């Protein structure tokens, strides 16, 4: 009998567990920026491609080096692949620092293993170049093809990474040193948590130094001098306070049968019964052979057999205040399958018997 995996999120009461401000919020404007670029990977051992856009890019690269191919010449670029290069530019990155990059094939290349990324410009949302990437790829996947067409692929050979593969050429401006206030944005919006964070800052700095703007933002008065502002933030982000209890949630992975239950999830009184039905369809092909002198034709006649089996469901009652942990144990005892539990949870939610959010992924 298959048992469900239950992960009980021990979300302790706010009075018993404190958190640092830096663990629940971040300074507004201090964030990563996504970069993207188009480039070529060369040096592949015959696992590249020869698509129109790859050939065009290859010719453009040769022209940039002063090499002009004769008109009508089509290069065989089986050792070249067109790729998209992506990276995250961290906040406060300076010119000359390096960042990691991910390289992904966009054509029909079989593998990027053993390839070298040619110089690629990485641009931001504004179209400006912020970093330049180049280097040898590290590919964890592999692929092999036999003479008879058989093929084996492990992991993903068309995606690779280059550690410190891009050099930062342009810095991203941020509003860290502007104005008289700094805003903290909560990772999880909650009015109670926002107010408690503001209260903790006011208790540390003095009254009216911080205020909750909404469920996600807390505005804090800060010194204008940058050096003082850094020291100020260092002290503030390490303050401990008691966040609000997390919202009652049930996260169910229907593919693995994993269930994550929040501490505050409760069930109202209900009675549950669930039966299972199995439909088996069997196709048989019968041959109709006519008499040799009859002049008829041999035909294949399909014969379909359908069998329906239904097992009787067991009923169990949920008492007031029962937790979802108790429900899952009851479902396991009656031998339900993962799909059965999904149906039971959805039905309980529709009946209003679950006090919390049900999220199925």
Curated annotation (Swiss-Prot):
InterPro entries: Flag_FlgI. It comes from the Bacteria. Its main location: periplasm. The keyword Glycosyltransferase does not apply. GO terms for molecular function: structural molecule activity. GO terms for biological process: bacterial-type flagellum-dependent cell motility. Pfam families: FlgI. Keywords: Bacterial flagellum, Periplasm, Signal. The keyword Transmembrane does not apply. GO terms for cellular component: bacterial-type flagellum basal body, distal rod, P ring; outer membrane-bounded periplasmic space. NCBIfam families: PRK05303.1. The basal body constitutes a major portion of the flagellar organelle and consists of four rings (L,P,S, and M) mounted on a central rod. Assembles around the rod to form the L-ring and probably protects the motor/basal body from shearing forces during rotation. Belongs to the FlgI family. This is Flagellar P-ring protein. It comes from Vibrio cholerae serotype O1 (strain ATCC 39315 / El Tor Inaba N16961). The gene is flgI.
């Amino acid at each position: 009998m298959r048992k469900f995996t239950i992960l009980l999120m021990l979300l302790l009461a706010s009075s018993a567990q404190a958190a640092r401000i830096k663990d629940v919020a971040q300074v507004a404007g201090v964030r990563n920026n996504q970069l993207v670029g188009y480039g070529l990977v060369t040096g592949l051992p015959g696992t590249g491609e020869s698509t129109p856009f790859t050939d065009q890019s290859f010719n453009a690269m040769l022209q940039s080096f002063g090499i002009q191919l004769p008109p009508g010449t089509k290069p065989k670029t089986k050792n070249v692949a067109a790729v998209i290069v992506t990276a995250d530019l961290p906040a406060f990155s300076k010119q000359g620092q390096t960042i990691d990059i991910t390289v992904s094939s966009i054509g029909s290349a079989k593998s990027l293993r053993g390839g070298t990324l040619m110089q690629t410009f990485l641009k931001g949302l504004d179209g400006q170049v912020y970093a330049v990437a180049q280097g040898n790829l590290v590919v964890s996947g592999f692929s092999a093809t036999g003479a008879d067409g058989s093929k084996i692929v492990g992991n993903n050979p068309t995606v690779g990474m280059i550690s410190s593969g891009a050099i930062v050429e342009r810095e991203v401006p941020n509003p860290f040193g502007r104005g008289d206030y700094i805003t903290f944005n909560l990772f999880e919006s909650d009015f109670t948590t926002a107010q408690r964070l503001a209260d903790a800052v006011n208790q540390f700095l003095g009254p009216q130094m911080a205020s909750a703007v909404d469920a996600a933002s807390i505005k804090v008065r800060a010194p204008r001098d940058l050096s003082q502002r850094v020291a100020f933030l260092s002290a503030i982000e390490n303050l401990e306070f008691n966040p609000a209890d997390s919202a009652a949630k049930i996260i169910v992975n229907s593919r693995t049968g994993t269930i994550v239950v929040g501490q505050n999830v409760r069930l109202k009184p209900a009675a549950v019964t669930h039966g299972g039905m199995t439909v088996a369809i069997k196709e048989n092909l019968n041959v109709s052979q006519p008499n040799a002198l009859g002049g008829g034709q041999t035909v294949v006649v399909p014969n379909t057999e359908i069998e329906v089996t239904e097992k009787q469901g067991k009923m169990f009652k949920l008492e007031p205040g029962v937790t979802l942990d108790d429900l899952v144990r009851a479902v396991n005892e009656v031998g339900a399958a993962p799909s059965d539990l999904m149906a039971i949870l959805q039905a309980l939610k529709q009946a209003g018997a679950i006090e919390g959010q049900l999220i199925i992924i």
